[in-house]
Amino acid sequence: MRGDLIRALAELNKRGPFDAVLLETTGLADPTPVALSFFKSAVVNMNFKLDAIVCLVDAKHVMQHLTEVKADNAVNESVQQVAFSDKIIVNKMDLVSAEELDDVVGNIKGVNSFAKIICTQNSKVDLKEILGISSFSIERSLE
């Protein structure tokens, strides 16, 4: 993934300046290699800035993913995504009760007390909440 991403960003850089480049990983992907790509390549590091890692979770199903025990001490990707995120969008809040939503938010805060949490439905989020927010910190991410 990292090599492909670095090559893709280098190609984009040749086309001219962009206001923003949004990267969406597939499902339960480890965000660490993506984030490290911004620091491992001189071309990427000089021309792109990792602004924030935003995680979108499904309010109805996130708890089963966060509490899932993986075989052979494998990493729980859901926990890793939440832990590594700067902002977490809890979507489909209309599909759970207020108590369930409080439980979801509480569990997310238990994994990541630094991230701002936005609860919404139909993925409606003001772009000012997720673009140009300068939330990423490599130091915090390594904690």
Named regions from a protein language model:
Residues 1-78:
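Nucleotide-state-sensitive switch-loop elements of NTP-binding domains
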Residues 77-143:
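C-terminal accessory "lid"/substrate-recognition subdomains
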